[in-house]
Amino acid sequence: MKSLEEYTEILVKSIIKKPDLLKVSTHDIDGTIKLDILVPQDVMGSVIGKNGRTIHAIRKLISLYAYKENLPKVEVNVESF
């Protein structure tokens, strides 16, 4: 099975124009997985989506994946560079 980072990369790369610039990292802090998604500023709108619908869907899919893999709670953070 794919790791959480690989799964996230597949999801986000499919919706952005510059998939080669995507960076995904994870950190385990106090039993919670912090997932950081870094994308270029000009594709940030694609990741967030209208009224945050796209990022909400991404977060939901990541949470479902974590549940299926018996991973702890995942907090998703999206930033631009």
Q: Language model features by range: what are they?
A:
Residues R53:
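ATP phosphate-binding glycine-rich loop and adjacent ATP-lid/helix-beta elements
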